[in-house]
């Protein structure tokens, strides 16, 4: 079962820059899928970096406020424990790969946490089968499509059985078909009771799986929408908020060239 996340008056600024996160308060329920959306540079990715612990340990800056995961303040969770608690999927999976072939990448986390050889084999096979990539275990990561690489990234996170998944624009390099398939993976993780936080521009593939959507502007949460509210949001308001339309067909229509007129 996933863990709840409680964020209180969170503010963060990168060294030498203004606030990237501004007084954010947010409660994420255990087993919930939430989407952080908004214009580029609004602070979505920075908020995910606080939740997964990359801020302030890998990204320096000024951090204030509180964040709790389950019953523990995040700062009291050791880095090794945090790595097992939170699985990460990034925009470009190559940025998180440590091995050259699929099996080695999925096994990497298990090896770091001292799993036995038999446990590693079992976890790798289960994660690969779950993501339907068992036929790729001996393949080089460099030969795979972006869609397959994202499946490997999910499998490598899933192998250590985290309770929380944090994803930063995971569909950015995927085509429409691969994006919908990625949505199926999220749906399956939700069915397992995992807590999932997704920073994303594309919304259409999440409309039937996300529980809530949070619009972020200038580092602050300015609007919260239920799934039903997001689906029924007027196009004019979507545009005003700087969001992409959650309706794929409407998006395709908007991108069509205008008919020539005399």
Where are these regions (language model features)?
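Conserved ABC ATPase "signature" region
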Residues: 118-136
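ABC ATPase NBD Q-loop/coupling interface
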Residues: 66-81
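A short, flexible loop at the N-terminus of ABC-type nucleotide-binding domains that lies
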Residues: 1-7, 12-23, 55-60, 78
